Amino acid sequence: LPEQPKSNLLSNSLNRTQFIQAISFLPLTGLTMKLEGLKKMTDSLESTGKMPVLFLGHGSPMNAIEENEFVQGFRKTAQTFEKPAAVLCISAHWETRGTQVTAMDFPRTIHDFGGFPKELFEVQYPAPGSPDLAHETKNLVQKAEIGLDEKWGLDHGAWSVIRHMYPDADVPVIQMSLDYTKPPVWHYELAKELVKLREKGVLIIGSGNMVHNLRRVAWNKLNAEEFGYDWAIEASAKMKEFILDRNHKPLIDYSSQGKTFQLAIPTPEHYLPLLYSLALSENNEEILLFNDKAVAGSLTMTSVKIG
């Protein structure tokens, strides 16, 4: 039997507070058609030029439908570069044994949370998928045997941010899963194999949160505009220093960086997407931080644009 995804799905009985706490070979005719389609895709990719790389702090699922400074940051950042030919998103909310990429034509919108307003569950983000990009990604990666997934779709780590960037859902989106059996350095090295996609107009997005400790959320500060515990602010400051200095080794070896990092990253899934984004950076590229705030004590929304 195929390995089932180890996702971050939450019971529908959870309320919002609990969520935060818990939170090929073809016939000749077919081949001709395929080549024509690939030519169109290649033409489109060539026209966009090299894409930047993003890490987006996605925060609460409510950011999908709320108008706040964080979604404004996503929107404004998307306006600073050309519309991509496609998006490849590495989301904190899709963990599997082995690495998968979504390969369907039309990925479903996954509402992988519970206890939120009906309005949030009614959101659909009907962006097309890209089987061609999924196959190209599979062929690029030599570090692992990439599986082609036909069941997952777009989880809220992807659609809750991308819908603000491309509200018309007119950019193809695929997701890549996080192999929960592998160490951080493995993820970093795998990400480096994706660099050629940037040259083909693919926007690669890591979606998570640098500091993400739901067990230590400050309940009395949930509605504060900005609040971070001292340890969260200290860990965030060190992370940002390493990022801006292009010093990735301590970020990869985060478990050896002391108590503040241990509190900031109690589990790896929201942090690992950052390593994917950093691995794709080049020495001469500009690095910009935005949405740089701590919320609810133990979460940061800090996001990164590279290139």
Regions found by a protein language model. Give the residues of each.
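N-terminal secretory signal peptides
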Residues: 1-14
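Internal, conserved structured core segments that host functional sites
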Residues: 133-188, 193
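Beta-strand elements within well-structured catalytic alpha/beta cores of enzymes
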Residues: 52-56, 86-91, 176, 197-210, ...
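Long, well-ordered alpha-helical scaffolding segments within enzyme catalytic domains
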Residues: 70-80, 185-200
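Short, basic/glycine-rich phosphate-binding loops at helix/coil junctions
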Residues: 54-55, 112-119, 166-175, 252
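A short aromatic-anchored loop/beta-hairpin motif
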Residues: 37-145
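N-terminal export leaders
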Residues: 15-33
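Surface-exposed, charge/polar-rich loops and edge strands
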Residues: 172, 182, 195-203, 212-307
